[in-house]
Amino acid sequence: AIKWTCDGSPEFTIEEVDKADRGSDIILYIDDDCKEFLEEARVSELLKKYCSFLPVPIAFGKKKEWKDGKQVETTEDNIINDTTPLWTRKPSELSDEDYKSFYTKLYPMSDEPLFWIHLNVDYPFHLTGILYFPKVKSNIELNKNKIQLYCNQVYVTDSVEGIVPDFLTLLHGVIDSPDIPLNVSRSYLQSDSNVKKISTYITKKVSDRLQSIFKNDRKQF
């Protein structure tokens, strides 16, 4: 096996070692000012935020169960993520209840959405996602930053200005695309050709859905 070692500087060492079992072991050493990342609750919080929909299973400790009035660990791995979230599946496989349940999972304290749009395009850019029209009772509930941006099912941010048009940022839901550049300024983002195409596509899908409801269900509209 190969052992890679680094102390945090640009330099590192690589050496051959004996290893009895298959797989990779990653050992991290935490500085004193970062000890919060050794706390189970903190690690669980970060995994839940960024890795809830990672495409590979993540085991974090063992499952627990109540026994004799207290929680005890079992021998079963505690898988903390959903590897096939709704937006990665075909709309034909999903029911209205599936969409509503997923919305409740994302926004536990919200009322059921009015309706939703399932996004799925592979060319000329890759984009998947689900956008929900929330039930809004007052202006106070018109909160932005409710659309979550993912890249290959890894959470990135809930600030999608420059990607989703401003007049649509009141929607809720998820968009996932590996074609959106990360860690760049908003002005650069708005000038990116793929981002422009994605923004136009989302606007058209929302417009088409609203137009369809207007024609076929005027009362709901």
Please provide the spans of the model-predicted regions.
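GHKL-type ATPase core
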Residues: 1-69, 78-79, 151-154
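Cytosolic catalytic headpiece
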Residues: 22, 101-102, 211
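GHKL/Histidine-kinase-like ATPase module
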Residues: 41, 69-175
